[in-house]
Amino acid sequence: MNISAAQVKDLREKTNAPMMDCKKALTEANGDIEQAIVILRKKGIASAAKKAARVTSEGSVVSYIHAGGKIGVLVEVNCESDFVARTEQFKELTHDIAMHIAASDPKFVRKEDVTPEYMEKEKEIYRDQAAKTGKPAPVIEKIVEGKMAKFYEEVCLLEQPFIKEQTISVGQLIATTIGKLGENISVKRFARFKVGDVGETVAISKASNEGEAEAPAAK
C-alpha cells in the first residue's frame, strides 16, 4: 500500500515519532492512522522495557501550582543524561506528570510501593464486601483481585489513567516518551500539598531507592 507524505506528516504531528517510524507504522496499519498510533505506542513501551535496567541519575525537580494557589506539587523525574533533561519533550512530560498529580492525588508512585499494611487493609474491606454475596471462597478471591486492580489505578501514579488522555496510563505516557528520547525515565518521588488538608501526600518510589527502573511491561 502506498503511504502519502501527508499521512506521514499527520502521524508525526500527532505523535512526534521519527518520520521513518511513522511510515513503517502506517504501512503496518494499512494507512489507518489511529491503528498506527497504537503501533507506535506499543513499540515505545517495548523500547522502554529494554531500557529499564539503565540508571537514571539526571533529571529535574518540577513544581506545579493549581486551583488559585490551593494545590501545589513537587515531583522529581529522573533520566540518564542532562542532555535529555533539557529537551522540550522531557520538560513537557515532567510538567504533565506534576499537573496530573495535582488533579488526581495519587498516594504512591508504583503499585509495588504500596505498603503491605495498606494493601491488606484494602483487601479485608473487599473480602468483607464480597463475603456478603454468599459466593464460594475462590470466587470471592477473584472479586478481591479485580477490586485491587481498580484500587491500584486509583492510588498509584503509574497505574492511573493520564488526566489529559484517559486511554493511556501515566506509566504508558512515560514509556512512550522513553521510546522517543531513547533513555530510561523514572519518577523518583513527589509531594502534594492542599490548603486546608491535614498533612500532605509524600511518595518515594522503592524502585528509585533500589536503583531499578520504572518502565511498565508492554500490554
Curated annotation (Swiss-Prot):
Its main location: cytoplasm. Residues 81-84 are annotated as: Involved in Mg(2+) ion dislocation from EF-Tu. Gene3D superfamilies: 1.10.286.20, DNA helicase RuvA subunit, C-terminal domain (1.10.8.10), Elongation factor Ts, dimerisation domain (3.30.479.20). It holds the Pfam family EF_TS. It is found in: Cytoplasm. SUPFAM superfamilies: Elongation factor Ts (EF-Ts), dimerisation domain, UBA-like. One of its GO terms (cellular component) is cytoplasm. Keywords: Cytoplasm, Elongation factor, Protein biosynthesis. GO terms for molecular function: translation elongation factor activity. InterPro entries: EF-Ts_dimer_sf (IPR036402), Transl_elong_EFTs/EF1B (IPR001816), Transl_elong_EFTs/EF1B_dimer (IPR014039), UBA-like_sf (IPR009060). Associates with the EF-Tu.GDP complex and induces the exchange of GDP to GTP. It remains bound to the aminoacyl-tRNA.EF-Tu.GTP complex up to the GTP hydrolysis stage on the ribosome. Belongs to the EF-Ts family. This is Elongation factor Ts. It comes from Koribacter versatilis (strain Ellin345). The lineage of its organism: Bacteria, Pseudomonadati, Acidobacteriota, Terriglobia, Terriglobales.
